[in-house]
Amino acid sequence: MNNRLIRVLATCMALVLTAKLGTIQFQGHKETWYNLDMSKVIERTDKAVGMTGLYHVREDGVKCYGQFVIVAADPRKHGRYTLVETSLGTGVVLDVHTTDDAELIDIATAWGKGGNK
């Protein structure tokens, strides 16, 4: 199968983001994943919400804050603490990404090599 056909099938089947897929289209936005140390993001968020202990990594390797998937997004499109729908569940914007793609949602995971925290 060629890459174009795989992408069409993935879109039609509403696949969820995986480490192997790397990038998918979901409900009008592009999703990718990243694996960085989240300790500074979590520290800042804990201070902002006045709580601690909400950070955890799900069994599938997705990093979460409470019930929400941690995502990075363009702050001009999605402000910090905004909720966004992702292929892996409802996400909360706790981080920003450094691309110019306002439609990109970058999902924090423990996949591959990286921060794992």
Mark where each language-model region is.
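Gram-positive cell-envelope targeting signals
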Residues: 1-20
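Solvent-exposed, well-ordered loop and adjacent helix/strand elements within mature globular domains
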Residues: 18-117
